[in-house]
């Protein structure tokens, strides 16, 4: 089975995450998209993270009706900080019948060279880079890299949503309904 790994904090999950995953499942030939919830991104501030169990619950609510989406929490049991290379190897060893491909946005592609063992990732795993309108992709000719130029660009970020909630903005159309209500009612209020 060909599985796309969409890793992220999902802090909170929003329609941009879901639209990209849906596009990749429907148009790029993935059998499944696994949402890999990272407990802590080594390149981000941990202080802004919601509780990981809450992030899991919100993601479960968001994808429950689509059988090509699954959630992967394999990273939760790994030493912290955990790194993408270690997670990919663990997935490869634990599920040898599957082909795992890393999905990243062009915002992450431009800093990919800062990732731990990025060359090892590049040599051993396929990477699909999807476009983000505020980030120019640096195209790189390598057999394991695919630039998905036609994917829809939905420029919503979790940081934008958190900021909007704190400012009292109406963000109901940026997140699945049940998720939006729970986030607004319980989180990020000043």
Swiss-Prot record:
Gene Ontology terms for molecular function: ATP binding; nicotinate-nucleotide adenylyltransferase activity
E.C. no: 2.7.7.18
Signal peptide per UniProt: none
Biological process annotations from GO: NAD biosynthetic process
Top-rank EC class of the record's enzyme: transferase
Keywords noted in UniProt: ATP-binding, NAD, Nucleotide-binding, Nucleotidyltransferase, Pyridine nucleotide biosynthesis, Transferase
Catalysis performed (reactions): nicotinate beta-D-ribonucleotide + ATP + H(+) = deamido-NAD(+) + diphosphate
Pathway of action: Cofactor biosynthesis; NAD(+) biosynthesis; deamido-NAD(+) from nicotinate D-ribonucleotide: step 1/1
Recorded superkingdom: Bacteria
Family label: Belongs to the NadD family.
Function statement: Catalyzes the reversible adenylation of nicotinate mononucleotide (NaMN) to nicotinic acid adenine dinucleotide (NaAD).
Protein name: Probable nicotinate-nucleotide adenylyltransferase
Gene that produces this protein: nadD
